Amino acid sequence: SIWEASGRWEAYHSSGQMFYCDMPNGSFCMAPTAEEAVFEFVRDNLKSYKDLPVNVYQIGNKFRNELRARGGLLRSKEFTMMDAYSFHASEEDLEHGYSIMKKAYLEIFDTLGLKVIPVSALNGDMGGKISEEFMFLSESGEDTILVNENETMAFNTEILEMDNYSDYLKQYYGIDDISTFTERHCIELGHIFQLGQKYSTTMKGTFKSNTNEDIPFFMGCYGIGVSRTLAAICEQNCTNEGLIWPDNISPYQLTIIYTHQKREIAFELYDCLQSKGIKVIIDDRYSLRLGSKIKDWKLLGIPYMVVIGDKCSGEAFELETRRDGSKKLLAKNDLINYLGKSSSAYIGT
């Protein structure tokens, strides 16, 4: 019913993108997006301008019957997404909240080591008048954008289909001249929207102003494709030998690999590093040779590796940095100090 109220049920239903089922007590869908559900929650709980602005977010799975599913995490029928929704008392406050979220998203991608370009785009079925995509330049991407020489401004080629695209670009995004812009392929990692009063008008959601008037909410919508962002990180950090996770998001800092004869030394080092808060994993598979273990862990992408061979006495350990392939021999305390400095780069530490 809330999808029918917003006017989007028929659009999603007829496009075939929505997973749904008809039951005796009504039709149900697996959420492809959450604007309607969030709006209903806010409409029933926020009544006054004093309650605004509000920004709510969630991280969870979305379901879309993608007609062009491809590339594993790049475009799948079930994916993880971080989506946020802001509610404001005026268009000016919406614009302010939008700019804060845009800055936050750019900082998130920068922390992840991904260079993204904010790209002017059409709002499409979402509604509203302004939206920007966060694009990661990649030849494997299926989106095409036009980018300026400095890679600081860009817009989606779909805008060129508008009759007044030059006026639109100038008015809303400050782009005057596109003669030097060139086509690039990219992957869309995030999208933010100024939805205005589209949903509050169709779904009848209002708040009391300071003059006691009923005013429809001004709404913003923001999303990051978590699954797709992981795919972009993998693409950017892949070598012929395998993946190399960036230090700050790798599930472990270090892999310990050892020969059967050096099991005791390996586990002493493992216990010591764990006690110091180092994120370490040890390969205790008995059936594999040392070379096979090394090959496996290079595929999995842990950024540092200690290989304990038959000649290791336990006084010093060879540390390999996967990023540049360099190796150094370090005493146990020096190894702990080195990895401790590396761990400070981890998100959340």
For each feature predicted by the language model, list its residue ranges:
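NTP/phosphate- and nucleic-acid-binding module
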Residues: 1-349
